[in-house]
């Protein structure tokens, strides 16, 4: 990954393919989130019929394992940053204790650099999903969600729409 980043100065942030301990892919690179998508994701039992279609799109599940893809949201579980990108865009925003800190930083870096998933390297990640198991963690999730959308815009976010359209278009090629 480091060799790739060094030879591609337009890349500011990248992540490898992330696997569950059983070897199955975790769909952690995602589009830039919208409130609608997060509500649909959380209420999957209500939106049963459309849920898989929405999640396939949001989680970019059609990303190929043999192709580098630009993504809107790089998971904080494993990220490789270009130092210059951090100097230019800043580091983690202190408003986000947990949840959305990686989403916010991905978005800021993407304004100036490419943010990519590099599927030729894999790492294993034990996913805890704490926000669905604890009211305290869920309340932190909701607080961070509100902080994120207060910062970037709730429903009318032209930048998010343009970026997500670009990310999805590359998957069609």
Language-model segments: residues:
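Conserved donor NDP-sugar-binding/catalytic core segment of glycosyltransferases
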Residues: 1-30
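Short linear elements at protein peripheries
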Residues: 13, 56-80, 162-173
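Residues that scaffold the ATP/ADP-binding catalytic core of kinase and kinase-like folds
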Residues: 28, 38-42, 88-89, 108, ...
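Short, hinge-like loop/turn segments at secondary-structure boundaries
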Residues: 29-35, 133-136
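Short, flexible, basic/aromatic active-site loop/helix in glycosyltransferases
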Residues: 33-71
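Catalytic donor-sugar/metal-binding loop of nucleotide-sugar-dependent glycosyltransferases
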Residues: 69-70, 77-79, 83-97, 103-124
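Active-site-adjacent helix/loop segment of glycosyltransferases
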Residues: 103-107, 111-173
